[in-house]
Amino acid sequence: MAVQQNKKSRSRRDMRRSHDALTTAAISVDKASGEKHLRHHVTADGYYRGRKVINK
């Protein structure tokens, strides 16, 4: 079993963990339908930037 040679300091541990934070998704509201969607993505209704781009 692998065992560390030297104890990692609190500083080293925290520096490693500095990249582990979660970020919230950038959610936008469509102008035409008022539906929430991810940025740069088409809504479920087929709208993108206020225009109908997909016909169902």
UniProtKB/Swiss-Prot annotation:
Example GO molecular function: structural constituent of ribosome
Region annotation (Disordered) ranges: 1-37
Q: InterPro entries recorded for this chain?
A: Ribosomal_bL32, Ribosomal_bL32_bact, Ribosomal_zn-bd
At the top level of its lineage, which domain of life is listed? Bacteria
Pfam families per UniProt? Ribosomal_L32p
Signal sequence extent? none
This protein's GO cellular component annotations are: large ribosomal subunit
| A GO BP annotation | translation
List the keywords (alphabetical): Ribonucleoprotein, Ribosomal protein
Coiled-coil residues: none
| Sequence ranges of Basic residues compositional bias | 7-16
Q: Which PANTHER family match?
A: 50S RIBOSOMAL PROTEIN L32, LARGE RIBOSOMAL SUBUNIT PROTEIN BL32
* Similarity comment: Belongs to the bacterial ribosomal protein bL32 family.
HAMAP family with a match to the protein in the record = Ribosomal_bL32
Question: Which NCBIfam families does the UniProt entry name for this protein?
Answer: rpmF_bact
- This chain's protein is named Large ribosomal subunit protein bL32
Gene for this chain = rpmF
